[in-house]
Amino acid sequence: MKIFNRKLKITSSALLTLCMVFVMTACAENSSQSEKSQPAEQTTVQPTTMSAEEINDRKLDKFISDMTLEEKVGQMFFVRCPDEDAVQQVSEYNIGGYILFGRDFDGKTKDEVVDDIHSYQNEADIPLLIGVDEEGGTVVRVSSNPNLRETPFLSPKDTYADGGWDAVKQDAEEKADLLLSLGINVNLAPVCDMTSDEYGFMYDRSFSSDVDMENRYVRTVVETSKSKKLGTVLKHFPGYGNNSDTHTGIAYDDRDYSEFENTDFKPFYQGIESGADCILVSHNIVNCMDGEYPASLSQKVHDILRNEFKFDGVIMTDDLIMDAITDFTGDEAAAVTAAKCGNDLLCCSSVDTQYPEVLEAVQNGEISKAQVDASVKRILKWKQNLGVFNIDTYQKKVKSTEPTDTVGSEE
């Protein structure tokens, strides 16, 4: 009887163990099937957040791709405003802007100047840069007219001598307010050249021969102007020093590169750091950089700005009609050579002859279309920064095809 009970206990225990194994196996299979029936976890790809600058770049790229080649080439011209047909020239060449000189202000009232500039802007499809040289002292295109300012602006040197840095800042503010009130959005200043020769070409226009003083002057002018949304132009890269006037012929500079690094370059670095959007390149030949071409026509000089200075703003020429350039290339070829070496804006007085030459050079591949696109993008960005051009509200103007009445025509 004890043996039977013992066997029964063993058998019951075995059955219990077998049942437990069966249940555990079934649960494992169900769990496995359940896992197989569940969809695999999906990795959610978060959309890449683009910066405002990247978004704007894409908008500009699209805008430029929709422009005609003729429109793009026109944007590269910063033209001396002609005596006649100034309004017609705006739409005929789709120019990037006008530079005004003393003759555009002489004897005019403020309202007359404002009306003139408004007529140019009203004709432009893409709003214009309207520039002027209002340095103070010997270069005062606007304030030399007593209808526009009671007295001309003093030179930077005299301004500082009269009132120190507060006076320099106030002077920059007053210039910005006056120019903007007329419709001018770019002042071709400050002068970054440093000269110690009182008989030198740039002496009266230069602020100081001391690097620290010149740097502070450039910073004050650029930052003050930028706060008002007045464009500035750092000039004349790479620095005239004590050289002669290139309006009357080519000037040669034999200084060592180290001298430029230690002196002349520094105000331009300061201007870039302070937010300047444009640099004007001079016509002097600087042998340590390029002994063959004037700086404005030198690929090597432009490479210094792009690669060493890391400057990605607008590079513009000095006036291509100056003797230093016309003696070197001839009038028609100057703009083509200037564009090929990397200038974005071509400052000229004869757009009617220069524009067709540049357009043809792009059409035949002498100047790449990609380079033109890059230049136009820099120009449009500058216009955006000045509040002149708004890509989000831009609407292309529809030009009238109706024939205009001709004075003296028969009815």
What would you call each of these model-derived segments?
Residues 28-29, 35-130, 134-144, 410-411:
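N-terminal hydrophobic targeting/anchoring segments and the immediately downstream early-domain regions
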Residues 88-214, 236, 241-254, 282-297, ...:
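Enzymes and membrane/adaptor proteins characterized by extended Gly/Ser/Thr/Asp/Glu-rich
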Residues 278-281, 285-290, 304-411:
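Active-site or pore-adjacent capping/gating segments
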